[in-house]
Amino acid sequence: MSSQNANLMREVRLFENHSEREQMENLSELFAVLNALEHLEKMFSRDHVSADEYKSECFKLIDQYKVTMRLVHGATSIEDFAKKYRLHCPAAIERIREGRPITVKDDQGNVLKHIASIVEQFITFLDALRLNTRAVDDLYPGLDDLYNAINTTSRVPIDAIVTTKVKKWHDRLSSMAASDEISDEDARQMIFDVESAYQAFNKALNELKH
């Protein structure tokens, strides 16, 4: 075999180390989940699956998305991911934004439950910061849950300041390595920003009651 042919037969490496391999696997998993969710939406719209089957599978895929998205380093939003990897999945993105199957109504009970969840996530994340949690892999999951909760409902009043301040730190942490730690100065500013967002959220809720 000639050297030229040998070079052609040589394995093409998609990663250089274990960390890059995990990132590649996580990206592939996220791509597969979104693709599956898009196909599920189309199948349900064409009556190829029952409502119960659709609901069960949709919840499962949304949960898989949440877990996988946390593991993908540097992914700031599902829209950016789909655009970067040329994945056309508008139905899947809409389902992820709403955080529920289309058959599950966003009734008052769900709204109140969602509000309570956001409040709890605000408090939990602020408590972690005040208890001197500084590692990115400890802080990011809680902040990601909060960020996604804020962005997956249309009926909870979200002031612009809430989204802006939370997104600022979500983007910052998602660009850092899991082993990194934020400085005490950054932690102080993060507490101030997230606390401000929390107060703005509560203010919007109070105005809604009146």
From Swiss-Prot:
Looking at the record, the residues that make up the VPS28 C-terminal domain are 110-206
Q: Name one GO biological process term.
A: protein transport to vacuole involved in ubiquitin-dependent protein catabolic process via the multivesicular body sorting pathway
Supply the PROSITE patterns for this chain. VPS28_C (PS51310), VPS28_N (PS51313)
Annotated function: Component of the ESCRT-I complex, a regulator of vesicular trafficking process.
Pfam families cross-referenced by the UniProt entry: VPS28
| Domain VPS28 N-terminal: from-to ranges | 1-106
User: For this protein, what is any one GO molecular function term?
Assistant: protein-containing complex binding
Keyword field: Endosome, Protein transport, Transport
What name does this protein carry? Answer: Vacuolar protein sorting-associated protein 28 homolog
Q: Which Gene3D superfamilies match?
A: 1.20.120.1130, 1.20.1440.200
Q: How does it assemble?
A: Component of the ESCRT-I complex (endosomal sorting complex required for transport I).
Can you cite an annotated GO cellular component?
Answer: ESCRT I complex
